[in-house]
């Protein structure tokens, strides 16, 4: 059972922003079993094809991302959610400036230890 001593109360303005490349920034809040990441993508940003053991749920707050999954293109716009199962290869393009709130279960170890080189490319 969780106690108040275990709870985290965080203002987004206090979350460190990391610049991954000229078109993508990221902010993360991590719990014991889940990760919440706000990803800010400028129009034209590309998240290369990748997969991971984590289940991913991107919730687009503003803008639009075009995902390529299983040979299909899916456009997810502000106010929409996409559920991406574990180990499913996917990539995405920002069709406009976009704010994406990603939920991962479990937390992305490659993001935490900064071995996510597929995102740290220069364009």
Descriptions of predicted regions:
Residues 71-86:
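Short acidic-glycine-tyrosine-enriched beta hairpin
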Residues 61-62, 77-78, 96:
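A cytosolic small-molecule/anion-sensing beta-strand core signal
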Residues 27-28, 39-40, 47-52, 93:
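Short histidine-centered beta-strand/loop micro-motifs
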Residues 86-110:
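Ligand-binding loop in jelly-roll beta-barrel domains
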Residues 32, 68-72, 95:
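Short strand-coil-strand connectors
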Residues 41-42, 52-67:
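Short, conserved beta-strand element in jelly-roll/cupin
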Residues 1-33, 37, 116-123:
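A short, N-terminal "cap"/entry segment at the start of jelly-roll beta-barrel domains
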């Amino acid at each position: 059972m969780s106690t108040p001593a275990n709870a985290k109360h965080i203002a987004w303005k206090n979350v460190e922003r990391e610049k991954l490349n000229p078109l993508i920034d990221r902010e993360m809040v991590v719990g014991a079993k889940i990760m919440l990441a706000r990803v800010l993508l400028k129009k034209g940003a590309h998240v290369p094809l990748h997969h991971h053991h984590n289940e991913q749920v991107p919730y687009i707050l503003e803008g639009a991302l075009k995902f390529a999954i299983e040979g299909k293109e899916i456009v997810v716009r502000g106010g929409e959610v996409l559920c991406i199962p574990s180990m499913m290869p996917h990539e995405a393009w920002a069709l406009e400036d976009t704010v994406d709130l990603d939920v991962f279960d479990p937390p992305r170890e490659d993001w935490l230890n900064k071995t996510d080189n597929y995102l740290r490319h220069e364009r």
